[in-house]
Amino acid sequence: YDFLHIDYKVGGVRRFDKNGLLWYEEYPSKEPSFVMNGFVYTLLGIYDLWRITGDEKIKKTIDKCVRTMKESIHLYDSGYWSIYDQDKKELATEYYHKNIHIPLMEVLHKLTGEEIFDSYNKRWKKQLNSKFNKAWLQIMYRIQPRLRRYSK
């Protein structure tokens, strides 16, 4: 658990965003990536540790992580699909959207009781079942790399 508190600047995974929110990076680097599923999986690991130990310090870390997700979850919604990260703002693959992002929202809602996670769970499930969204997603998968290339 202590290794999580090593800042990314010195080889760790901890980072704070411009709003002072705590993040654990799946891919620590100079520029923040803020990969949603990597952060949430870290949160779930910390939660398991707290369940075993009951340590209040660990519970405070969980509370900070939940706050981060509550205040940042909107950044992972394109309006028609979930987003993988905040660096490249990659649209999640259908596999990730269906099998990772949606279930993670369900788990976060069950563990925290926070309605915002249930709201995104339902929203993303609805997006998954939209034929229009799936067609638009295929177009965006082709366009996004080109847009990034030309915007540099």
Predicted regions and their residues:
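Long alpha-helical, hydrophobic tracts
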Residues: 26-30, 43, 53, 63-68
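Glycine/small-residue-rich hydrophobic helix-like segments
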Residues: 61-108
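Well-ordered alpha-helical segments within folded domains of soluble proteins
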Residues: 34-50, 93-110
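Long, well-ordered core segments of solenoidal/helical folds
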Residues: 1-17, 56-80, 119-136
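Inter-helical turn/loop segments and adjacent helix faces that build the functional surface
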Residues: 49-59, 111-115
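Membrane-proximal basic amphipathic "stem/tether" segments
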Residues: 126-152
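A structural motif
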Residues: 7-23, 33-46, 73-74
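Acidic/His metal-coordination segments adjacent to aromatic residues that form catalytic metal sites
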Residues: 18-33, 80-88
